[in-house]
Amino acid sequence: MPKVALAQIAASDDREANRAAACELIREAAARGAALVVFPEMGFDPFFPRHRADPRYFDWAEPIPGPTVERLQGVARAHGIVIVANIFERAAPGEYYDASPVIGADGSVLGRSRMAHIAEAFSCRARGSR
């Protein structure tokens, strides 16, 4: 049965450092025999929706492929591992998604899943009804 690794970094405003830390975790997962590594929602940047009044965070959105996905494609290809990431995608001017690209072990983008919006920061930690 294939091994699945779950990976999470302590993301900061330093996007290149975030990518490097993620790639190190991917290399470690591959070395331990994982065939697939999965990152959480908004796994490569601080969870910025809590600062929704600050428009500068839209500058962090990137296309697929873009800087983060291209970096992940290289490490996937080098280590023969499948990666499911999650980034803030800019699909077109004014069109943004919380997107999960799937990168194959050969480095190709196999597909992506897009959410229509990022969770509202004020309700994402609300008490449940039970």
Where in the sequence are the language-model features?
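Active-site beta-strand/loop signature of hydrolases that rely on acidic residues for catalysis
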Residues: V4-A7, N18, I26-R56, A76, ...
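Active-site-proximal beta-strand elements of phosphoester/diester hydrolases
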Residues: M1-D13, V38, A99, R112
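Glycine-rich anion/phosphate-binding loops
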Residues: E16-A21, P65-G66
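A short acidic, glycine-rich active-site loop
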Residues: Y57-E70
